[in-house]
Amino acid sequence: RVLFRSQADGMDIIQFDEPAFNVYMADAAQWGVKALERAAQGLTCTTAVHICYGYGIPANLDWKKTLGQEWREYEKIFPALAASSIDQVSLECMHSKVPADLMALLKGKDVMVGVIDVASDVVETPEEVAQTLAQALKFVPRERLLACTNCGLAPMPRDVAQAKLEALVAGAALARARLDSQA
């Protein structure tokens, strides 16, 4: 009911934050996407899902250490998400080990590329942001690519969050200018 009231009040996008997919990746393609479909059923606004890799939880940090040099876990669920009614998929790309080529598995979806690391107070440069977007553009059409943060900025100091958002805007503008100059 809350989602329908929010939509009726003018909300354009409803994003589902999915913290369990990464823990239960083997099962998420079956039950997780069905749960998302059920939650989004009847909504006419844009729907998105953020599959969170998690922050600060010892079990999650330990799990990440076992993933090796490439985090290919998304490969298990992206085909099911691509076939779903969810419109957008949000990915953590800055300083993660998720290979950019996995984005190709989300054909037909808008891909929100996390270009800001929320686990560090170090502010990205516009060049770093533009480079991350350039990598994504090898696998996602320009009209389907959206720049975003890896996750929420709430835990960090306001001035750091502001600087990171400014880097996101400047980096996206830089990437756009480079694309436009090639056209």
Regions found by a protein language model. Give the residues of each.
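Domain-level signal for soluble alpha/beta catalytic cores
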Residues: 1-183
